[in-house]
Amino acid sequence: MKPLLLVLALCGAQVHAHSVGLRPDYNDYSDEDTRRDWLPEPLKPVPWQSETRYAQPQEAVVQAPEVGQILGISGHKTIANRPVNAFLGIRYGTVGGGLARFQAAQPIGYQGRVNATVQSPNCAQFPELDRLRLSESRGENVDDCLTLDIYAPEGANQLPVLVFVHGEMLFDGGSEEAQPDYVLEKDVLLVSINYRLAPFGFLSALTDELPGNVALSDLQLALEWLQRNVVHFGGNAGQVTLVGQAGGATLAHALSLSGRAGNLFQQLILQSGTALNPYLIDNQPLDTLSTFARLARCPPPSINPSAQGLKPLYDCLARLPTSQLVAAFEQLLLQNEHLGLTQLGGFKLVVGDPLGFLPSHPASLATNSSLALPMIIGATKDASAFIVSRIYDQLARLQSRNVSDYIDVVLRHTAPPSEHRLWKQWALREIFTPIQEQTASLQTVAPGLLELSNYILYRAPVINSISQSYRSVPAYLYTFDYRGEHHRFGHLSNPLPFGVDASLSDDSVYLFPYPPEASRLNPLDRSLSRALVTMWVNFATTGVPNPSSGVWPQATSEYGPFLRFTNNQQSPLELDPHFGEGIYLPNYRVIYKPTTNFSPPITTTTTTTTTTTTTSRPYAYNPYANWQNRPSQQHPNWHPADPEYVRAQEARQQEFIREREQRRREQQLRDQQRYPQQEPREQQDERIRQQREQEERLRQQREQEERLRQQRELEERIRQQQEREQYEREQQEREQREREELERQQREREQQQPEQQPEYNPEPVNPWGYPVQEPQPDDNPEDGRLPYPSYEQYGPEGNENLPETDANRNFSEEDREQQQQEQLRREQQEQQEREYQLQLEREQQEREQQERGQQEPGPEEYPSYEEYSRALQEKNAERDRIYAEEQERERQQQETLLQENQQHPEQSLPEEQPTHPNYEAYDGDRSYAEEQEREQQRRDQVEQEREEQPDEDQGEEYERSPDEEEAAEQDVLKVEDFPSYEAYLEAATKLREEQEEQEKLEEERYRAQQEEEDRIQAERERNSRN
């Protein structure tokens, strides 16, 4: 009984298995009529019917004889109900230190036990500069970064291998960008590679020490490692497809053209990038090296570098830490960013590298059909939106009505200078209308500028890459126009005045769930992702994206047909024969001759295709107008089994080929007719360019001479100022010594005069020579007050030797001459101070003008240097004239003072602030008669006032205390006590203000005292009346 039940169970299992079929990949639709014809193959159950489940980390062990025991993560993710193992951070090469960081890596040997459960850090890049510095401070090796990640389904066996090369701009990114969530729904292995970036992968001196193109050697080393070991992970080494994104596509294509890849990979998928991209080829690697060395503070290479001449640079680069070299590269990008993509360096491929990867230009290698591989190649619709958005501000500042001005800005940032004229002619012929050439505005020409940059950077390189290879190997063209919910970068958030559909790397969002915020797709995006993944995996498996239908035929020319991914829900996949018709410039087939003969075109079986009809100028006007209302591109009566439709399609294709050839011949004929007229114009343009260059060199030379002259003038002014200050210090010292000598001589004469002069006044006299008088009757002995201050209050306390206190002394002629000389010296000093003050004022005005930004116009503001020199001479002559007039006025003023001093010598005496009254100012002959008479009149007036007020109290006589006398002496300021005359004036002004304030306070006190006395007097009068 038990054997019978076992047999029945086995039979039932077979029947169930037969009814269910193989493992479901997509949903099946039972209704064949409702199945959409654009689908690449019949739909099966939805792979994303449930969210990805993360299992607990367990070890997945792989034994690789050349490597050792590799421990990965078993069940890293569960995708489509199937566990996926992950092997992360497996080293495939080793990088040395010092200068070896810029050279080819060495294969890694047997490692024993390898821990492949942790994601390895990315190679050195400036977005992770802080991490590099922290790792270096810990003593970690940040240069040994050559690792790869492998994702394999559980139980994989001889599956095709997809090797992803991350890219964009070749100076950032890492292997973590390739996640298995979408791709591993299919039976395929996914590998992602880390390689050296920026200067460590591309800096070149075209020598063995700095070869360049080291990133290509890293990729080759990783692919060699996979050829030996991928079989142990369940992969097929004979079915390796290299998938590159942007810059990664450039590396993948360049490696295939190098001829050194051999059988390391068999097919290519190039997304928005080829080896012919103009902005990823460095045509001047030595200039880039020189600029980088300067920013890294290393000795730059000489003009004709040699091995011995480059040794100091090598030693410096080997000595610097990795983080400092990365920081120097970041400065290189920021410094040259305004020059455009074609002028940036340090992250680009070089031609003629010693490693032999690019012995000649990639365009020349692309003409060799023996190096061609089957490929899927294309680009996103608006891949160059990122560059147009970055230069949009420059375009907005033009405000021009001529479209040529806008084209020049775009070409400066996107195309090599040698191709500017060719691309400009093509743009005016194929993109812009004649009306826009004279009535342009940024809003109207911006879509055309975006289309022009797309052709230069992406579509033209695609067309030129397959212009010869499509004859010998299959090539499938595509353009990704689909605009979904998520985008790879923020290029769509730009100031462009129109919508952008798909920008750079947006197609990768539907191939890998990266970045993490783009990992959750809506139903429409998931449908597009399923179609894209299926085609990519089908190509990796069979070499044909759609083996079961004719939706995507291979290219029959460099222009198509091509497949377009769109937002049209009725037909998301559209076929169009015009990928880039009309792009004949630049013609690389003429610039780079083919290296081998081409094989005849291969014969393919006729397939049913769906085409769209476009004009010969598909983007002549606004290509984005009414795109949502575009009619369906599919024939209403189309059916793959309709032979009439097939014949009609073939006839249309033949007609299209004939029309294209006719237009090409007509264009060549027009070019030949214009050639005789263009040649003189080109010669004239070249002559004008040479003249402008000569004028520019002369202008720069004159500017250099002018800067040197200004520098010399500045040094001369500084020297003169220093000499003037030194002279002033010496002059002050001499004046100080002369004053001291005069004072000493004066004291000696004063000591000698009392001995020589006879006494002529027998009467007793006071110290001032006045006769001693009897007390006047108006003195009040009771209160001691006098109606006016007595002469005794101004007595010379401790100053008997001063000239003004000596009553018997008259000024002699010798003293007067000395004082006149002193006056002349003071006037000379004041003259010098006024000149110095004028000079300071002029310098202050110049500084204020510079601070306000009112600088004098430079040579560039004048039509020619002669007019600038003439204007500069006029300004200098005007300044000299003003200065001469100032000098002349000062001289006339000085002569006037001298004449007055000669006519009135007694008025030229210096005015000094006396400590005591100087009566010579009132009476020069010392008779004192008038003074005595005035004193008697004052006494009589005071006596009369006292008689009128007999009872008024008399206040005490005010006498100065010794402290007040000392303070009065200290209040006298002398010029020699101050470092400059300005300081003396400031101190004198301050002292005068203090004295005035003190006088006001004394006056208020006196007024208050008078009021108090009046009040007391009034009180006495009232008492007396009572």
From Swiss-Prot:
Where is it located? Answer: Secreted, Extracellular space, Extracellular matrix, Basement membrane
User: What segments bear the compositional bias annotation Low complexity?
Assistant: 603-615, 855-866
An example GO biological process term is: motor neuron axon guidance
Q: Per the UniProt annotation, where are the glycans attached?
A: N115, N368, N402, N810
Record keyword Signal present: yes
Disulfide connectivity?
C123-C145, C298-C316
| Stretches with biased composition (Acidic residues) | 945-969
The UniProt entry's GO CC annotations, sorted and at most eight, read: basement membrane; extracellular space; vesicle lumen
Q: What is this protein called?
A: Glutactin
Species this protein is from? Drosophila melanogaster
Point out the gene that encodes the protein.
Glt
